[in-house]
Amino acid sequence: MASFHANSARKAFNSLQSAVTFYAHNVSAHAAMSLVADAVDIVVFVDREVTATGTVRYVSEILEVHELAENGQPASTPIFGPDPAREEFDPRGYPLHQPEGNALWARRAGLDLNWLHPSRGEWAQPFPERQLA
């Protein structure tokens, strides 16, 4: 497990690729992205927003990472993300669907995948009122 800073879950791939090529000068950009796709199981994106009561941090997206795709980026599946029906007033993530494949990463981490079932996808508290600009 590691912490890495990026502006979105998908932008984490390019940031990780840049780090690999910066520190391993003999690795091509394509090889670096392939290493990222092989090494990363999931990306958890924690976002933040200023609300009327202060800054709130929340999980907005979880991507399950797969092999390198033809476009040169790791293929990924959003398993947790914003609900379009609620996004206007609640940007937090909600379960979208179960992970693909055997989800070995989840078992290794002790994650009960039942928590990613849409019927269990409710936060304990409503999202705080947004601060007016």
Predicted regions and their residues:
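Conserved P-loop NTPase nucleotide-binding/switch module
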Residues: M1-I42, V50-Y58
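NTP-binding/hydrolysis catalytic cores, primarily Walker-type P-loop NTPases
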Residues: T53-A133
